[in-house]
């Protein structure tokens, strides 16, 4: 089983509030704020919010597939090159904020459950499209 999934986050510097959303192809888009106990006021900035979105996306897929996760390949698409640099190890762990390092560790634990997990950065992001317009493998 293969999952193509998209996630994005926004962060308001003035109010310090974040909006996080993700979409798993073939499922209805989810609003993380309604589904998670995480305080969205706790994000440090937009980069941290993007990492939280990746974490919640992985947790949602794990909840959805349960024990079948070992048979699943996951492709996560985000517009955050900051998350990609940390994910790929381009940034040394000593240079990563402790909050992001904790998220990376949690994401790696989720990744161990799947057959494979790949993170792709999609630049030129222009916001969410309707699910029927989103390119997904069937």
Where are the language model's segments positioned?
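RNase H-like nuclease fold core
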Residues: 1-52, 59-63
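RNase H catalytic domain
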Residues: 11-14, 55-137
């Amino acid at each position: 089983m293969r999952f193509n999934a998209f996630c994005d986050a926004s962060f308001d510097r003035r109010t310090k509030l974040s909006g996080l959303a993700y979409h798993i192809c073939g499922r209805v888009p989810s609003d993380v704020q309604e589904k998670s106990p995480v305080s969205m006021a706790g994000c440090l900035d937009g980069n941290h919010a993007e990492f939280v979105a990746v974490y919640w996306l992985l947790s949602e897929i794990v909840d959805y597939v349960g024990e079948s996760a070992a048979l699943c390949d996951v492709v996560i698409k985000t517009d955050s090159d900051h998350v990609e640099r940390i994910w790929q190890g381009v940034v040394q762990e000593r240079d990563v904020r402790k909050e992001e390092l904790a998220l990376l560790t949690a994401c790696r634990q989720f990744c161990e459950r799947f057959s494979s997990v790949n993170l792709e950065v999609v630049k030129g992001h222009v916001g969410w499209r309707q699910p029927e317009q989103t390119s997904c493998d069937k």
